[in-house]
Amino acid sequence: MMMADIATAFPAIKILRDEPLAHYTHTKTGGPADYLAFPTNVQETKSLLAYANQISLPVTVVGNASNLIVRDGGIRGLVMILTQMAAITTAGNTVTAEAGAALITTTQVAQAHALSGLEFAAGIPGSVGGAIFMNAGAYGGEISTVAVAAEVLTPEGEIRTLNQAELDFGYRHSSIQDYHDIVLTATFALTPGDGAAIQAQMDDLNARRAAKQPLELPSCGSVFKRPVGHYTGQLIQEAGLQGLKWGGAQVSTKHAGFIVNIDHATATDYLELIHHIQAVILEKDGVTLETEVRIIGEEPTTQK
């Protein structure tokens, strides 16, 4: 029996065909997804994955698309954006958030319950699932210090709960990247604190972020991982690359570790600029800059 296409098979779920991912990424770049689905709960996510597996449709999962570059050729198969799964609950000293919940909102819920430990994440624009996926961090804090469990959907469709050890956190890394699990929820173990003091620390970090980072322009956040013994922004600055324009993309004049979209940039502009920076820094300083930003999708069939 011939299977219906996935959009037809799930009329109750919002599924768009040939949808430009530039509408969703924080860089405002990226080609189309063959199918873009917005599941609202675990069962819908599980059903979409099972159906896609049945018809051999590749599956890609995206959270808030903040630290992400989608190539201009887009993504074949099914892309699921989990931002409709955003419930956050508290119990005692723990906060449990669905994968699509904004990390910023999660920190605000923790503060409202006078729970300390997530202050460092107050300005990180990603989702909870994305934060687990890459062990997000800022200002000396990392998700690995507070995330004690994550409920995941395996590529085979099994729901499992991973403990902190099984999440195998490292610098901008977790086991989710190795096994291609889909994060469904994450649980954070926090410490009782003073709500006003927690808010004051969050306000301070947000002010520091606003002063140093180009928040007013589209970007993918930190482009590169910090190389041992160096500061990425400083290396780029000293190489004379700050302010360099490449198509519609530019090395931020506010913080050289960021690439901003100043004039209808394409993902290709971003990626070519990234490769240029890597080549210059390798030749000048002998330092290999690894990308922190997640890069997915296919090259365009015709280059500009």
Curated annotation (Swiss-Prot):
PANTHER family found in the cross-reference section: UDP-N-ACETYLENOLPYRUVOYLGLUCOSAMINE REDUCTASE
Residues at the catalytic site: R172, S222, E292
Record pathway: Cell wall biogenesis; peptidoglycan biosynthesis
Described function: Cell wall formation.
Enzyme class: oxidoreductase
Protein name in the entry: UDP-N-acetylenolpyruvoylglucosamine reductase
Any GO molecular function: FAD binding
Gene3D superfamilies per UniProt: 3.30.465.10, UDP-N-acetylenolpyruvoylglucosamine reductase, C-terminal domain, Uridine Diphospho-n-acetylenolpyruvylglucosamine Reductase, domain 2
Catalytic activities: UDP-N-acetyl-alpha-D-muramate + NADP(+) = UDP-N-acetyl-3-O-(1-carboxyvinyl)-alpha-D-glucosamine + NADPH + H(+)
An individual GO BP term: regulation of cell shape
Domain of life: Bacteria
Subcellular location: Cytoplasm
Record's keyword annotation contains Cytoplasm: yes
Cofactor: FAD
Residue ranges of every copy of the FAD-binding PCMH-type domain listed in the record: 28-193
Keyword hit for Ligase: no
Pfam families, sorted: FAD_binding_4, MurB_C
EC number: 1.3.1.98
Native species: Levilactobacillus brevis (strain ATCC 367 / BCRC 12310 / CIP 105137 / JCM 1170 / LMG 11437 / NCIMB 947 / NCTC 947) (Lactobacillus brevis)
